[in-house]
Amino acid sequence: MSLNFLDFEQPIAELEAKIDSLTAVSRQDEKLDINIDEEVHRLREKSVELTRKIFADLGAWQIAQLARHPQRPYTLDYVRLAFDEFDELAGDRAYADDKAIVGGIARLDGRPVMIIGHQKGRETKEKIRRNFGMPAPEGYRKALRLMQMAERFKMPIITFIDTPGAYPGVGAEERGQSEAIARNLREMSRLSVPTICTVIGEGGSGGALAIGVGDKVNMLQYSTYSVISPEGCASILWKSADKAPLAAEAMGIIAPRLKELKLIDSIIPEPLGGAHRNPEAMAASLKAQLLADLADLDVLSTEDLKNRRYQRLMSYGYA
């Protein structure tokens, strides 16, 4: 798979293009008198060094771009790479099956767990089918149905957050979008089973929170979590989406800032260049964090889980 480079990665893209060009020449004519292997090796080392330098000093807007990267792993990618025996469950038993939310039972190191997550699309048709990862009320009601099923069978719940926000269409509002989100917030705070939430890409406002109330909340290194998109904030404050980079910095949407505010528990490091550069390595790190979180939560009684979750929620807003 050829990498899709972002604007701030263009110096890296130029080096990678040179490497690809030299490699192609070498493959076309193996009888060339010149040995280009050393040059390719040198350029690859230079590319890694340059990537380290660029990624060591990323701003909030650049991280927001990475969180939206079209090649970034989605929920179903992590399900495939980190879990076994996934059986997808569909429908809210009231209206429809919202493809922007996926969920089902799987095994994590042999242990049954309930997985729920946002799912964006890659190709145009899939993006439309998944509504670009923006759930309607039936998606959140499906998520709640699966959470209640997990509680009934005493299975831990693992959620993956990756949405620009809940779908704001007229139909969604008519079917009770705000009520569906509010009900999920309430019911998740009352769950009697361990619940682990991880932001894997965009954590967009109430659309993210509706599956984001848990005993542990993690973020991938280059994910974001915010009440509004940087473009939306800029449009309100400065009447121009061009001010999005300024808004991103001011809003504190990145993982280190949110951990500093005690809104999340852990930051999961990403491979050099972002999760899309090495999905397998990213999935391994994510799996290790989930197993560690489950080990921490397994020793707690149901009452302790609920009390800790309540105290966590009540602490929000205090420095």
UniProtKB/Swiss-Prot annotation:
Recorded catalytic activity of this chain's protein: N(6)-carboxybiotinyl-L-lysyl-[protein] + acetyl-CoA = N(6)-biotinyl-L-lysyl-[protein] + malonyl-CoA
A GO cellular-component term linked to this record: acetyl-CoA carboxylase complex
Domain of life of the source: Bacteria
Pathway(s) where this gene product acts: Lipid metabolism; malonyl-CoA biosynthesis; malonyl-CoA from acetyl-CoA: step 1/1
CoA carboxyltransferase C-terminal domain span: 35-296
EC code: 2.1.3.15
Keyword Nuclease: no
Protein location: Cytoplasm
Primary location recorded for the protein, binned into one broad class: cytoplasm
Assigned keywords, A-Z: ATP-binding, Cytoplasm, Fatty acid biosynthesis, Fatty acid metabolism, Lipid biosynthesis, Lipid metabolism, Nucleotide-binding, Transferase
Single GO molecular function: ATP binding
Any one GO BP annotation for this protein: fatty acid biosynthetic process
EC class name: transferase
Recorded family membership: Belongs to the AccA family.
The protein's role, per its UniProt record: Component of the acetyl coenzyme A carboxylase (ACC) complex. First, biotin carboxylase catalyzes the carboxylation of biotin on its carrier protein (BCCP) and then the CO(2) group is transferred by the carboxyltransferase to acetyl-CoA to form malonyl-CoA.
NCBIfam families in the record: accA, AccA_sub, PRK05724.1
PANTHER family assigned to the protein according to its UniProt record, in alphabetical order: ACETYL-COENZYME A CARBOXYLASE CARBOXYL TRANSFERASE SUBUNIT ALPHA, ACETYL-COENZYME A CARBOXYLASE CARBOXYL TRANSFERASE SUBUNIT ALPHA, CHLOROPLASTIC
Subunit structure, as described in the record: Acetyl-CoA carboxylase is a heterohexamer composed of biotin carboxyl carrier protein (AccB), biotin carboxylase (AccC) and two subunits each of ACCase subunit alpha (AccA) and ACCase subunit beta (AccD).
Listed name of the protein: Acetyl-coenzyme A carboxylase carboxyl transferase subunit alpha
Provenance organism: Escherichia coli O127:H6 (strain E2348/69 / EPEC)
